[in-house]
Amino acid sequence: MRFLMLFFIGVLGVGFSQTELDLKDLEKKPAGIVRDYYLWRYISDKKTTLENAKKAYELTQNKNSTLQKAMQEKGVENSEKSPDVKLPEDIYCKQITLESMLETTDAFQASCIAIALKSKIRDFDKIPLQTFKPLQEKIKEAYPVLYEELEILQSKNVSASLFKANAQVFSALFNHLSYEKKLQIFEKHIPIKELNRLLDENYPAFNRLIYQVILDPKLDHFKDALAKSNATQSNAQTFFILGINEILRKKTSKALKYFERSEEVVKDDDFSKDRAVFWQYLASKKKKTLERLSQSPALNLYSLYASRKLKTTPSYRIISRIQNLSQEDPPFNTHDPFLWQIFKEKTLSLKDEGAFNAMLKSLYYEKSAPELTYLLSQRNKDKIYYYLSPYEGIIEWQNTDERAMAYAIARQESFLLPALISRSFALGLMQIMPFNVGPFAKSLGMDNIDLNDMFNPNIALKFGNYYLNHLKKEFNHPLFVAYAYNAGPGFLRRWLESSKRFKEKNHFEPWLSMELMPYSETRMYGFRVMLNYLIYQEIFGNFIPIDTFLEQTLNSKDKP
C-alpha cells in the first residue's frame, strides 16, 4: 500500500489545468491519445504560432486526419507571416507538385518523394511519363513496393499485371487507387489461379481487401471470381466473408465449408469463433451446432442467441452491481484523462496478481466503479461480464427503452468511463465528437460548455441521450439508431435506401444484412450495442426475445 500511496502522490503532483494549453506542459505529459488530443487543441488555437504548432505536431503519436487537417490549416493561415517555416513532411510533401519536385530532385529525400507519389496515384493517368519516371527511380531502393505499384500502372494491361504481383503489392495499389479506377480494372478478366495464389498468401492487407470487395455495392465481377476460387490458407475473417459471398449466391454447401474453415483457424478470438459456428448453424440448421455454440465461454450476440434459444445456462457470468463500494470520493479525479491514462497503464503493466489487486483496492468506490470493472475485465480469466448502470439520477428516464439504449451505447462507446478519448478525439462517456458539442449544447439550452465538459458524466450523459432521442425520431429500431450514432444518420440513410439490406425475409435475415454493413467499425458496433441493449433490458426487468426483436428490422418504416 505504501507503493500505492506514493504512486498517487506522483500522479496528483502532475495535475494540469486543461483549460490553458501550454506546450511546455504538454511536452511533459505521457505520449498517447490523450496528449494527441490536447496537442490538437493547441495546434487549433488561433494564438498558436506556426512554429510552435509544428513542434506540437511532431510530439503527436498518431497523426490522424484531424491533426493533419489542423496543421494544414495552420500553415495556410500563417503562410505570409511565416514563409520560412516549412510544414511537416507528411503534409508538405503531399502539397508539392511533382513538376516542382522534379526541378530540384536532389533537394528532396526519398521519403518525401514517396509521399508525393502516393498522393498522386489517383491521378496517375494525368501525369506525363517524363515527370513521373525520374521520380519513380529515386525511390526504387527505399520503397520497392511503391516502385512496383507504379510499374504496374505503366503496363499495357494493368489488371493482368496486378494479378501477377504478390499480395503486398496488390493490396497497396488497391488502396491507393480511386474507386472509379478500381471499377475499371476489376471489370477485366480475373485469373482464378492467380487469385487463389493471392488468397493463400494470407497477407493481412489483402485479407482486409477481400472483406471490402465482398461488402462493396459494385465490384460484382471480382465477387464472382471469388465465388469461383477456393481459398485454403487464409485467416478466419477471410474464410468467413467468403462464406457470406457464397450465401449471397445461394451456394449454402460451399458457404458451410468456409464457415467450418473459419472456425478451424481462429485464434484467441471468441467472437470470430462463435460467429463461424453460428453461421454453420444457419447454413445447416443442425441442433448440435447450436448446442455447441450455447456452450461458448464468451458473451456475444451469437452465444446469447444460442443459450436463449435452447434455454440453457451459459458458462459466462453477468454482474450488474459491485457490492460494498465506498460512497466517498476516490483518491484521484476519474474525470481527468491524463490521470486515468497514467493509472490504467501502470495497473495493467503489473504482472503480479497481488500488486494488481492492491492497485484495484483504490477503486472500490461507487464513483470509480466503471474504472474498477474496466480493469477487472482486462484480466477476465473467469469470463465475467460487467453491466453496471452508474450515474443514475442525472436523467429522469422516460421509459426502460430510453434507459437501456443510453447505457447500451455508453458501455460500447467508453465502458462507462468518463475520461475516455478515442483516436478520432471523440470525448467522454458518450464519445461525443468535438464538432457536435456546440450544437448539442445550444439545443439543450446549456451555456458556457467547453470540450472538457464532456469528461463530466453529468453533462456527457445528457448530451448522448439527447442525440439518441433525436435519432429515434427518424430510425425506429435500436439497431438503426446504433448504426446512426456510430456512422452518422446521413450515411445510414443513404445505405438503407441504396442497398437491398433489411428488405428481404428468409432464414438468413436479418443476420445477413447485419454482416453486410460496409463499415467494419459500425458492423461490430451494431452487434455489440444490440447485445448490451438486450442485457440491460433484462437487468431492468424487461426480457426481449432476440428473434422477434431483430426481425422487427425487416418491418421497419426507416426504409422506403
What are these regions (language model features)?
Residues 260-265, 295-298:
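Amphipathic alpha-helical segments of tetratricopeptide repeats
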Residues 19-20, 29-37, 45-52, 59-112, ...:
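Generic helix N-cap/helix-start motif at coil->alpha-helix transitions
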Residues 405-406, 423-447, 459-468, 490-491, ...:
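Substrate-binding/active-site groove segments that recognize
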Residues 213-214, 246, 284:
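Residue at a conserved register position within TPR or TPR-like alpha-solenoid repeats
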Residues 356-416, 465:
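Export/targeting segments at the very N-terminus of extracytoplasmic proteins
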Residues 483-542:
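Catalytic and substrate-binding regions of cell-wall glycan-acting enzymes that process beta-1,4-linked
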